[in-house]
C-alpha cells in the first residue's frame, strides 16, 4: 500500500464522491481473471484484503486499486509454432501463403497457446484526495497512470483531470538549488541528479557523487546544463527523486515511519491498513503542499 511513485493530477472541477454510488460505478468495471481465450483483463480490485468494497475510504481520502492480468506469450514461442504451421501448410498445398492467411494462422496459434500461458498481474493504486481535488497515482510511467485514469473515467462517465504543473519552471528551481546551495530548510539534496542539455540525447547522470563538484557547477553556471532530476530527502521522513515534469519516483519511507503503527496487532489487518493509509496520505499531502509553495504554486491554465 505504501506508494513508490507519485504522479499527481488536478481535477479541473469537483466531483461528487458519494461512496455508495462509487461502489456501484466501480462494480461495472470490476476485475475478473482471464478466461482461457483472454489475453488480458483490467478492472477494479478491493484495496482491503477480504473486503467486498472496491474502494477504501478514510475521511476525505479514497483509495482504489486497478488490477491488470496479462497472459505472457514469448514472441519466440509464437514464432516457432507459427513457422512450423506455415511450412507444413505450404508444403501440403504446394504454394506460398498470403499475408492475410499467415495472420489468420498467427491468431489461431495465439488462441491455442493462451490456455497454457503464464499470467502477469499488475496493481496500480489511485489515491483520491477529495478535499484538495487531486488524484495521486502510484505509477512510474505516464502510460500506466493514464490507463488507470481511463478506467476510472469509464467507471464514472467523465473525469476532468490534467497533470499537476507548477508555476515556476522546475528545472530552473532545481538548478538554482544546486548552484546557489539554497535548498529549502526541509529538504536535503542527495548525491544523485540528472543534468540535461538543449539536445535531447545530451544527458549526464550523476550517482554517488557530490553535486557541489566543480565540473558539475561549471556546467550549470555556463548554462550548458540544467538539473532535470534530483534525489532528495525530506525531514528524515522519506527519500525520493523529483523530476522536472513534476512527478516523483522511487519514494522510500523511512523505517521509523513505516514502523509507527507496529503497536497494532498483525491479526488486526484492517486497523493496520487504515492507520498506515492515514499516515501515508498525511505525509504525501504535506509534501505536495510544500512543493507547490516552493515552486510558486500551481501553473495557471487557460
Swiss-Prot record:
UniProt xrefs under InterPro entries: RdgC
BP terms from Gene Ontology: DNA recombination; regulation of DNA recombination
Keyword Ribonucleoprotein carried by entry: no
GO molecular function: double-stranded DNA binding
Residue stretches spanning the membrane: none
Pfam hit, one: RdgC
Main location: cytoplasm
Keywords assigned by UniProt, alphabetized: Cytoplasm, DNA recombination
Protein location: Cytoplasm, Nucleoid
One GO cellular component term: bacterial nucleoid
Top-level taxonomic group: Bacteria
Family per similarity comment: Belongs to the RdgC family.
Function: May be involved in recombination.
Name of the protein this chain belongs to: Recombination-associated protein RdgC
Organism: Haemophilus influenzae (strain ATCC 51907 / DSM 11121 / KW20 / Rd)
Gene from which this protein is expressed: rdgC
Amino acid at each position: 500500500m505504501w506508494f513508490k511513485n507519485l504522479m499527481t493530477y488536478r481535477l479541473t472541477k469537483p466531483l461528487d464522491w458519494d461512496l455508495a454510488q462509487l461502489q456501484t460505478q466501480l462494480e461495472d468495471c470490476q476485475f475478473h481473471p482471464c478466461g482461457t481465450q483472454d489475453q488480458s483483463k483490467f478492472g477494479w480490485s478491493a484495496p482491503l484484503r477480504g473486503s467486498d468494497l472496491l474502494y477504501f475510504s478514510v475521511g476525505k481520502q479514497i483509495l482504489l486499486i486497478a488490477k491488470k492480468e496479462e497472459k505472457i506469450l514469448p514472441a519466440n514461442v509464437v514464432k516457432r509454432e507459427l513457422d512450423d504451421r506455415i511450412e507444413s501448410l505450404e508444403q501440403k498445398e504446394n504454394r506460398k501463403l498470403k499475408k492475410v492467411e499467415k495472420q489468420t494462422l498467427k491468431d489461431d496459434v495465439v488462441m491455442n497457446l493462451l490456455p497454457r500461458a503464464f499470467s502477469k498481474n499488475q496493481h496500480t493504486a489511485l489515491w483520491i484526495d477529495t478535499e484538495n481535488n487531486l488524484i495521486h497515482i502510484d505509477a512510474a510511467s505516464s502510460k500506466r497512470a493514464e490507463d488507470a485514469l481511463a478506467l476510472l473515467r469509464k467507471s464514472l462517465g467523465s473525469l476532468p483531470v490534467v497533470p499537476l504543473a507548477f508555476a515556476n519552471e522546475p528545472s530552473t528551481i532545481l538548478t538554482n538549488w544546486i548552484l546557489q546551495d539554497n535548498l529549502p530548510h526541509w529538504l536535503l539534496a542527495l548525491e544523485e541528479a540528472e543534468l540535461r542539455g538543449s539536445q535531447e540525447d545530451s544527458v549526464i547522470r550523476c550517482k554517488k557523487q557530490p553535486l557541489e563538484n566543480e565540473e558539475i557547477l561549471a556546467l550549470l553556471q555556463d548554462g550548458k546544463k540544467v538539473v532535470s532530476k534530483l534525489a532528495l530527502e525530506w525531514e528524515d521522513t522519506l527519500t525520493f527523486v523529483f523530476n522536472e515534469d513534476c512527478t516523483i519516483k522511487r519514494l522510500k519511507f523511512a523505517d521509523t515511519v513505516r514502523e509507527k503503527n507496529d503497536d497494532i496487532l498483525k491479526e488486526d489487518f484492517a486497523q493496520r491498513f487504515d492507520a498506515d493509509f492515514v499516515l501515508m496520505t498525511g505525509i504525501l499531502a504535506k509534501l505536495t503542499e510544500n512543493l507547490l509553495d516552493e515552486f510558486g504554486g500551481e501553473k495557471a491554465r487557460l
